[in-house]
Design a protein with these regions (language model features):
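Glycine- and charge-rich intrinsically disordered segments
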Residues: 1, 7-8, 125-129
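Surface-exposed intrinsically disordered loops and tails
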Residues: 3-26
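Intrinsically disordered, low-complexity, compositionally biased regions/tails
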Residues: 11, 24, 55, 119-120
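Intrinsically disordered, low-complexity segments enriched in small/polar residues
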Residues: 18, 41, 49, 69, ...
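Amphipathic, interaction-prone secondary-structure segments
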Residues: 23-66
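Generic structural hydrophobic/aromatic packing signal, biased to beta-strands
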Residues: 38, 70-72, 107
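Acidic, aromatic-enriched beta-alpha/helix-loop junctions
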Residues: 52-93
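Low-complexity intrinsically disordered segments
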Residues: 77-130
Length: 130
């Protein structure tokens, strides 16, 4: 798939080492990772993040992820609804929540549904806030 989330992560994940600990077992716990906020071709937006303190699998920097954390989509997206943290609230706001451990397969379906990642717009906005 041209717009797979794993491909996007591979090309755009920024990792910063926060602590110079030489212990290789601690390395993944002392990093901060960040991905650009995704803008799709139809205007749908969402944050997708991976890393040691996030709802993603695996927890370390990896070549491929099986599940990612999604945050604050621009509109209610039924494909990811069941992973919403606030699903059991009386009136959940699906645009104001985090979605934990969303399978990559589902994220790719969301991207396809919304026309794929508009990489030009995604990176333009990322440069504005970086």
């Amino acid at each position: 798939m041209k717009n797979s989330i794993n491909g996007f992560i591979k090309n755009h994940l920024k990792v910063k080492v926060l602590y110079g600990n030489k212990d290789p077992l601690m390395k993944h716990m002392m990093t901060s990772s960040r991905l650009p906020h995704i803008v799709c071709s139809d205007g749908f937006e969402m944050s997708v993040q991976v890393g040691s303190h996030l709802y993603s699998t695996p927890k370390k920097v990896a070549k491929r992820y099986s599940a990612v954390e999604i945050g604050f989509p621009s509109e209610h997206e039924p494909l990811i609804e069941k992973w919403a943290e606030n699903l059991f609230e009386d009136t959940p706001d699906f645009t104001d929540t985090v979605y934990s451990y969303v399978p990559v397969k589902v994220v790719n379906q969301v991207l396809k549904k919304h026309g794929g990642i508009d990489l030009t717009e995604t990176l333009r906005r990322y440069k504005e806030v970086a």
